[in-house]
Amino acid sequence: MSMPATSTKTTKLATSLIDEYALLGWRAMLTEVNLSPKPGLVDRINCGAHKDMALEDFHRSALAIQGWLPRFIEFGACSAEMAPEAVLHGLRPIGMACEGDMFRATAGVNTHKGSIFSLGLLCAAIGRLLQLNQPVTPTTVCSTAASFCRGLTDRELRTNNSRLTAGQRLYQQLGLTGARGEAEAGYPLVINHALPHYLTLLDQGLDPELALLDTLLLLMATNGDTNVASRGGEGGLRWLQREAQTLLQKGGIRTPTDLDYLRQFDRECIERNLSPGGSADLLILTWFLAQI
């Protein structure tokens, strides 16, 4: 399909650099979905708490999204002179078109809608920073993405409409701000918790997959995951957070033997129909930011 125009301004970014970041985004999505075993999530072992999607759907979806990530970067570069609050409006048509390709690739299954939002923001932030000759670091990328989202939670969640979206309902009932709140705050769960935790485990020589699984547990224990709350209510969310925290307190995932705990956790999540998709999205960002 035809791609939305980004801007009338030109970008000075090299195509090879843009493609390099887009490739990292694709690899981040594949790394997350292939990671196994993940409680309640689609992985190489099973489909978790999902009956409508499988591993191959995520592979097709990631490939479709990869083709759009350069457009997010280019728009971030071309809009570098705009006020940051104005950037999000220009990103929306790119995100919607990307989402359309995702649904076509998966025959209508929502595999990566959250990642289109979050990776799209980070890619646009990278484009802006590169265009302005500013350092591209996890902190600068997330703070720039946050500047794009200033006021987003207030605009989209604090509403008194009679027909509430799922996100608005969870905000009003439980105070959960979900992906919008995390983005507007500059991804603090990633920057302050998941990313340093993951990098520390790698520095200690832990196997990268075990380190990522342990980091996923950390996110599940701390994230107010709206995916979980929409399926299991506040009780389901608190149960999942408590179980993840208990595993971390017992030592987390440090050896292949510890994977037995995750397999049991996975079975319990499937029985309760709980899937921590929001934490999975944040794990994608964690891996992505660890590479830059």
Curated annotation (Swiss-Prot):
It comes from the Bacteria. Its EC number is 2.4.2.52. Pfam families: CitG. The keyword Transferase applies. GO terms for molecular function: ATP binding; triphosphoribosyl-dephospho-CoA synthase activity. The gene is citG. It is an enzyme of class 2 (transferase). Belongs to the CitG/MdcB family. The keyword Plastid does not apply. It comes from Shigella flexneri serotype 5b (strain 8401). Gene3D superfamilies: Triphosphoribosyl-dephospho-CoA protein (1.10.4200.10). Keywords: ATP-binding, Nucleotide-binding, Transferase. It catalyses: 3'-dephospho-CoA + ATP = 2'-(5''-triphospho-alpha-D-ribosyl)-3'-dephospho-CoA + adenine. This is Probable 2-(5''-triphosphoribosyl)-3'-dephosphocoenzyme-A synthase.
